[in-house]
Amino acid sequence: MTNKQKTDALDKLIRMSQTIKEHNSDNPDFKNWKYLCVRTLISIYGEKSSEAMQIANMKFYYNPRLWVSGRNYSQEHLECFNRDFEQAIKLLELLKSDKEL
């Protein structure tokens, strides 16, 4: 894969992120995007690369140490999703800029 192909692939992922309107880790469009991110980063950087593992290990949902019955965690889930989603996009942008050098 040439550097041009790599930057094009990363740019495609960044553009695809803008089409995800429902900020929910169960959203099929989001799940497909995350899977494609991981597969693309593996093809660029390798199976055990920190770049691929960084996005693969992002949770995109709130995981409290202790679940309280009847408690609504939707706000916490949204905050965690937005934080991780923004972090993933920034990582893709950083990786793209590194390849453009």
Please give the residue ranges for each predicted region.
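Charged interaction/catalytic cores of defense and host-pathogen modules
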Residues: 1-100
